[in-house]
Structure formats: C-alpha cells, structure tokens
Regions:
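Membrane-interface segments at the starts/ends of alpha-helical transmembrane spans
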Residues: 4-7, 39-54, 127-143, 219-221, ...
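Helix-loop-helix module between adjacent transmembrane segments
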Residues: 5-8, 12, 19-29, 62-65, ...
Length: 418
C-alpha cells in the first residue's frame, strides 16, 4: 500500500514550491536591503502598473456569478440530477465561511477601521465616522466571495458532474489547454498554484497569529492549538464539519456579547446600517475607482491589494467549497454562499469594528492616536477588548474562536493540497 501511495506522489509538484520558498527566504535573509528594493518594484508593478486589471477582473467575476445563479445554468446540480446535499445548510455554510476566511476576519474586524481612519482618502470623502466603516464591508463582501464562488461551482462541476477527481488547476484548465494539461504547461500551472497556496497561507499566519499568540500568552502562557488541529485531521470532513459548527457558535456568541453588553449597541446598529447603505449606494464607484491622478493611491494600496489577496486564496478555498457542495445546484451554491459568507462577514465587521469606532467617535478613548503613535495593531486590539465588560471572558472566546478558525481553514487546505 505504501509503495502504491508513493507512486502517486508527484515529487516535483510537492517539493519544488518548498525549495523555491526556502531559497527565497535565504536570499531575503542574506540581502535584506536589495530584496526590499526588488519586492517594492514588484509590488509597484502589480499594484500600480497593471492594477487596473485586478479591478476589471473583480467586477467581471461578480457579474459572472450573478449570471450563473439566475440563468438556466443555475439549475444544474453538482452531482447526480436527483442527488441531495451531503451536509445541512448550516453545516455547509459553516465550513464554507470558516475555510474561506480563517482567523484574519477577527483581526481585521477589530482593527481595519483604524487603518482607514488614518488614510488621506477618508478625509477626501468626508468624516471618519461615515467612511471608516464602509470600506471593510466593501473589501470583504461581494467581490471577494465572487472569486470563491465562481471557481467553486466550476470545480464542483468538474468533480461531481464530470467525475474528474484530480483536484489540480491544470485539470481545470484542460478544456482550454487540452493535452498540454498532462505536460510541462500543466506542471507549471500546478507549481504556480501550490506556490500561491503556500504564500497565501504564510500571509494569513503572519497577519493574525501574533494576535492569537498575544492573547494566549496574556491568558494562559501556553499554546493549545495542536490537539484541536489533530482532532480535525484524524476525523476528516466530519472533524472539519464539527470544528466549523463549533467555530460559528463561538463566533456569533462573541458578536452577541459585544453587541449586548459592550455599551455601544445603539451605535453599532445605526452606524452599521448606515455603512452598509453607503457601501451599496456607492458600490459601482468603489469597484471602479482607480485614482488615475494618484492623489492618495488608495485603490493601489487597498482594493487592488485585497483583490490579489483573494485571488491567492482562490487556489484552495474554491476546491474545498466545490467538494462540500455536492448535491446542491449552482444557484444554491452561489446564492447560499453570498447569504452565509457575505452575511456573516458583514455582521462581523459591523459589530466588532463599530464597537471601537463608537468609542472613538464618542471620544471615550482615542484609538487612532494610539495607532499613529506606535503602529501596534495587536496591542490596539487588546486595548479595545480591555474596554469591554468581562474582558477576560471575551479574550478567552476570541482565542478559542481564532483557534477553531485556523484549524478548520488549514485542515480544508490540507485536504485540497493532498
């Protein structure tokens, strides 16, 4: 059996991305200044020179998702024509939401409004209270989930209708590249996909893990993630489904506590409702804003960066979503994804983001000055939580929620990569 499994391992696809990443890490460590210069130029090229194409792709993929949902293709079942979904709507939505966002959503829900509040573009638009809560909803809602859902139904169709079990991007590209999917071109596509997957995973760890570590050290002084991760791996999709449901209960429990006992409930609801309205009212303008005069570089620094970020995560999350969507129609997958994915994301940013923003607007504390002074977002989030009643309880729930998010999302990635 081991010999059979070893023959199935594509060592080139498996090892090459790791070798490339280790080599790049060595170069970055040995030549930090030169590497920083090169990376800055690469970032400028993709964010500024060709950034418009990211915006165009974002709008296009949203339109495609809507078309697939409302057209005749929406009735196509991802599986046999009369097949029923394998998971309940709640279980399916929980897995999709947690695998698609990881623990980043908690970090950004608490802190992203502060970064916008210090951006010159906000001053061009109006007040911090009006706009700092709008952009998180825009950058984390419809277009990001459109990236996931369009590819998810494509991969689901490939896996469950065409019965093609090779979960590789080269296989997904076969209708376009034909027999070259089995050749050098297919290998190159798979190498790029796996490299992007590893890079995206590293980015996610680098963003939210310091917050997780800071909370754990403050509360316990130990790391407790290994047992949770091992449980999910050993129990496969059932383990992932259980962790996803647990994560959702913790997640919405956290939001409910902050909303009801944090003391900013009225502001959270009113400003959240207003921010959602502003986002929908200005959605087309926000989606196509390029800042051609480069007065603020806001779309280059934020919107284009985020669209690139979601594209990288589209290497893994859509395969997993497509896999668990067996038995659902294309319409159910897309619209259900928007309802559960976008809905949960918006609620998170509205509640957690507007809690801190409410304290800032009411001048009960000055988080913006703190961020400007030291740039420490992790310390800022801890300070935000410390202003809440039962702060230690909320810290415990937050850390458990982050662990569950990480375990679910990276287990799903492990299954996809395997």
């Amino acid at each position: 059996m081991n010999k059979l499994n070893s023959k199935r391992i594509d060592w080139l696809i498996t090892l090459a991305p790791f070798i490339i990443i280790i080599s790049l890490a060595g170069v970055l460590f040995a030549f930090p200044n030169e590497s920083n210069t090169i990376i800055s130029k690469v970032r400028y090229f993709f964010g500024d020179t060709v950034g418009i194409y990211y915006l165009i792709i974002g709008v296009a993929v949203l339109i495609v998702s809507i078309y697939l949902a409302i057209s005749k293709y929406g009735d196509v079942v991802l599986g046999e024509p009369n097949e029923k979904p394998r998971y309940s709507f709640f279980g399916w939505g929980s897995m999709m939401f947690t695998c698609g966002l990881a623990a980043d959503i908690l970090f950004y829900s608490f802190a992203e409004w502060v970064m916008y509040a210090t951006n010159p573009h906000i001053e061009e638009l109006g007040s911090v209270a009006e706009w700092a809560g709008v952009f998180p909803l825009f950058h984390w809602s419809f277009i990001p989930w459109a990236f996931y859902l369009v590819l998810a139904v494509a991969f689901g169709f490939m896996l469950h209708v065409k019965k093609i079990n090779r979960q590789r991007y080269s296989e997904a590209c076969r209708p376009i590249i034909g027999k070259h999917a089995d050749g050098i071109l297919g290998r190159i596509i798979d190498l790029f996909a796996l490299f992007a997957l590893l890079a995206g995973t590293a980015t996610t760890f680098s963003v939210a893990t310091p917050l997780l570590a800071a909370i754990i050290v403050k509360l316990f002084g130990i790391t407790i993630t290994c047992a949770v991760y091992t449980y999910a791996v050993l129990h496969g999709f059932k383990g992932i489904s259980f962790l996803a449901k647990l994560c959702i209960y913790l997640f919405f429990g956290l939001l409910l506590i902050v909303l009801l006992i944090g003391g900013q409930g009225k502001f959270i609801i009113e400003n959240g409702f207003q921010s959602l309205g502003k986002m929908l009212q200005n959605f087309i303008e926000l989606s196509t804003f390029t800042d051609p005069g480069r007065t603020s570089n806001f779309p280059q620094d934020w919107t284009i960066y985020y669209w690139a970020y979601w594209m990288v995560w589209s290497v893994a999350a859509p395969f997993f979503i497509g896999n668990i969507s067996r038995g659902r129609t294309i319409k159910q997958t897309i619209l259900g994804g928007y309802v559960f994915g976008v809905g949960s994301t918006i609620v998170s940013f509205v509640v957690l983001g507007n809690y801190g923003l409410g304290l800032q607007v009411s001048e009960k504390t000055d988080f913006i000055s703190q961020y400007v002074a030291d740039g420490d977002l992790y310390g800022l989030i801890l300070n935000i939580i410390d202003t809440m009643p039962m702060a230690n309880v909320i810290l415990v729930i937050t850390v458990l929620c982050m662990i569950a998010f990480y375990a679910t999302s990276f287990d799903s990635i492990a299954y996809t990569a395997a």
